[in-house]
Swiss-Prot record:
One MF term in the entry's GO annotations: structural constituent of ribosome
Source organism superkingdom: Bacteria
GO biological process: translation
Biased composition (Basic residues): 9-20
NCBIfam families documented for this protein: rpmF_bact
UniProt-annotated stretches for the region Disordered: 1-20
Gene this chain is encoded by: rpmF
Keyword Ribosomal protein set for record: yes
Any Gene Ontology CC annotation: large ribosomal subunit
Lineage start: Bacteria, Pseudomonadati, Campylobacterota, Epsilonproteobacteria, Campylobacterales
Organism: Helicobacter pylori (strain ATCC 700392 / 26695) (Campylobacter pylori)
Keyword terms, alphabetized: Ribonucleoprotein, Ribosomal protein
Keyword Ribosomal protein part of the UniProt annotation: yes
Name this protein carries in UniProt: Large ribosomal subunit protein bL32
């Protein structure tokens, strides 16, 4: 089993964890003017 050569500081560990956040889906405006999520079917027009 691997053993770390040296201790990772709190600051370095925190810098690495900055990319762990959840990315929120950004709604886009469809052709008909309604807002929808990308890669989802529109409830009204049934378009992808």
């Amino acid at each position: 089993m691997a053993v770390p050569d040296r201790r990772v500081s709190k600051t370095r560990a925190a810098k690495r964890r900055t990319h762990y956040s959840v990315k929120l889906a950004k709604p886009i405006k469809a052709k008909d003017g309604t807002w929808k999520l990308p890669h989802h079917i529109n409830k009204f027009t049934k378009e992808y």
